[in-house]
C-alpha cells in the first residue's frame, strides 16, 4: 500500500513541477508580446548606422602621398598603389590606387594609419553586384561620396539605438 501512495505523491510533484515550467515559459512569451518588432522591411526601411560603422572606403586622390602605409598595415596586403618617382622634385607621384572590396575585410587599419587622412570609412554597406570584378574600385570609384541614407526621401530610416533601461 505504501508504494502506491509514494508513487501517487511523486506523480503529483512531477505534475506541479511541469505546470510551473510551462507557466515560466508562458510568462517569458507574454513578456515578449509587448515589444516592438526587430524586423525591418529592408528596401523601404534602413537602419541608420553608427558613427564608427566601417563601410566602403572613401579615397581622396589629392591628399595621397603614395607612402604605401595602407598596404603595409593591411592584413591581406590589399590596396594596390601604383606610383612613379619624379626625379626633378624627388617625390612620388600617385598614378593609380585601387581596392578590391570582394577581398577586403573592412578592418579599418588603412584608415587608422594613413598619415595624410586621405582614406575614410563611409556608411555605405550595399556593395552587392552580380559580377565580382565590379567590386574592384579604382581611385575614381573610391572618390565618390555615397548618398546619405538620411537624405533619401524614398527610404524610411530607423534609428539603431540601444534601449535605455530605467
Curated annotation (Swiss-Prot):
Q: Which residues bind [4Fe-4S] cluster 2?
A: 74, 104, 107, 110
One annotated GO molecular function is: NADH dehydrogenase (ubiquinone) activity
Reaction(s) catalysed by this chain's protein: a plastoquinone + NADH + (n+1) H(+)(in) = a plastoquinol + NAD(+) + n H(+)(out); a plastoquinone + NADPH + (n+1) H(+)(in) = a plastoquinol + NADP(+) + n H(+)(out)
Task: List the GO terms this entry assigns under cellular component, sorted alphabetically.
Answer: chloroplast thylakoid membrane
The enzyme's E.C. designation: 7.1.1.-
Q: For this protein, what does the record note about how its cofactor is bound?
A: Binds 2 [4Fe-4S] clusters per subunit.
Q: What does this protein do?
A: NDH shuttles electrons from NAD(P)H:plastoquinone, via FMN and iron-sulfur (Fe-S) centers, to quinones in the photosynthetic chain and possibly in a chloroplast respiratory chain. The immediate electron acceptor for the enzyme in this species is believed to be plastoquinone. Couples the redox reaction to proton translocation, and thus conserves the redox energy in a proton gradient.
Name this protein carries in UniProt = NAD(P)H-quinone oxidoreductase subunit I, chloroplastic
Name the source organism.
Trigonospermum melampodioides
